[in-house]
Every structure is written in structure tokens, then in C-alpha cells.
Amino acid sequence: MTRLTVLALLAGLLASSRAGSSPLLDIVGGRKARPRQFPFLASIQNQGRHFCGGALIHARFVMTAASCFQSQNPGVSTVVLGAYDLRRRERQSRQTFSISSMSENGYDPQQNLNDLMLLQLDREANLTSSVTILPLPLQNATVEAGTRCQVAGWGSQRSGGRLSRFPRFVNVTVTPEDQCRPNNVCTGVLTRRGGICNGDGGTPLVCEGLAHGVASFSLGPCGRGPDFFTRVALFRDWIDGVLNNPGPGPA
């Protein structure tokens, strides 16, 4: 199959996926994570209910997907760090923040492009064994096809199911560039069903210890892929500019 044929097929699938798409929440085919296995994970919540994932990339900033806030009000949303069991308060490890400001860089919801957002927290996170910062790749860095990565988050184990009480994770493989788009990193699971599904937007794709992607959307049935992640390396210079010039905190 030629590159043009693949891109044409992807364009058609993108159009059909947008018609029935919703924010992403589920990790399909995953395993239960251990406590503090992914201490950089953020649970973004509305009135105590998880609706998107994210990653702490600075003591004052969480990286997530811009699409998460297409139908959510940031004024009543909170960011929770250090969470593990969403049904417990976990007072010793959990830190909860309001959103001070939001930054995005040309998000295009029609084409699912530039689906990345930085959330400035109302105060600095207290870094502990349960709350750590996830490093980012350098500007324009690439991740090779065949690289093994991980994606983790709270969510049901099947489409339409209930949210998971604990975070789950799945090992995924980066697909060749001609099966993806230049602005994305795409992944799949080679031997079985697995990956992101409805509602898991914003959770990071971690490859070799770096946040190479932000979960954006998936083509086809949940767990069958390919899954599309915003390519973080294209935004590193912009991200650094935001982190180095934060807005004022709450009065």
C-alpha cells in the first residue's frame, strides 16, 4: 500500500471517527498498576468524577489534551495528583488543585490537530514518591517505529464500562510513520487487543522514560487501534516558553 493510499484511508477514518467521538477514558487490555508505578499521572475531574488524564511536567503545570475541555468547564474542574484508588480520599498521598490558567497552541478540533493543553495549577505541587515530574523529549526528537511504550490511566476495561477504581496500563508499540500523521505518534498492540478508548484523552504516552505523546483519539473499535497521540516533541519549545513565563497565581 502506498503512502498516499494510507494517508487517504486515514483521512476517511478520521472523518468517520470524529462523527462519533467523545473524550477518551478507557485503557483496554491493560493490567492493574502498582501504587506509585506512575507517580506523574494526573486525574482531571469534574465534581469528583475523573474525565481525562494528564501528566505533571513541572511543579505548576500538567500536560493534557485540549479536546478534554471541549465539553467540560475548567472553572469547576480540578486536577488530582498522587491518586491511586479513586474511591478513597487517600489524604496522605493525594493533592488536589484548581486550574489557574490554560494554554493551547492552535488546537484544531475538526482535524484533531495540535491536541495539547497545559494546565497551570493554583500552586506548586509538593513532589513526593507519589507525585513526580515526567520528563519531555527535546524539540523535534523522534521515536522510532517498533519502540515499546506504555500508556496508563483510569478507565473501564471495555468500551462503555465503568471507570476503573485503580489505574491500569498497557504496553504498546509505535507504528511506522506511513501509518500515522506527521503531527502524531501512533501506536498499536501487536498480539492482542489493547490501547486507549472513549474518554482517555490527555494521558501520556511514555517511551524510554519520556512523554512522547498525549492521547488524542483512536481509529476503529476500542483496543484495535491505531491510537493517535499528539507528538509532544513538536511543541517542546512552545512548552518551555509557557513554563518559563507562568501567568499570575490566584489573588
Curated annotation (Swiss-Prot):
Keywords: Antibiotic, Antimicrobial, Chemotaxis, Disulfide bond, Glycoprotein, Heparin-binding, Membrane, Serine protease homolog, Signal, Zymogen. Residues 20-26, 25-26, 249-251 form a propeptide. Residues 1-19 form the signal peptide. It is found in: Cytoplasmic granule membrane. Changing residue 68 to S: Loss of antibiotic activity. It is a peripheral membrane protein. Disulfide bonds join 52-68, 149-207, 180-186, 197-222. This is a neutrophil granule-derived antibacterial and monocyte- and fibroblast-specific chemotactic glycoprotein. Binds heparin. The cytotoxic action is limited to many species of Gram-negative bacteria; this specificity may be explained by a strong affinity of the very basic N-terminal half for the negatively charged lipopolysaccharides that are unique to the Gram-negative bacterial outer envelope. It may play a role in mediating recruitment of monocytes in the second wave of inflammation. This is Azurocidin. The lineage of its organism: Eukaryota, Metazoa, Chordata, Craniata, Vertebrata.
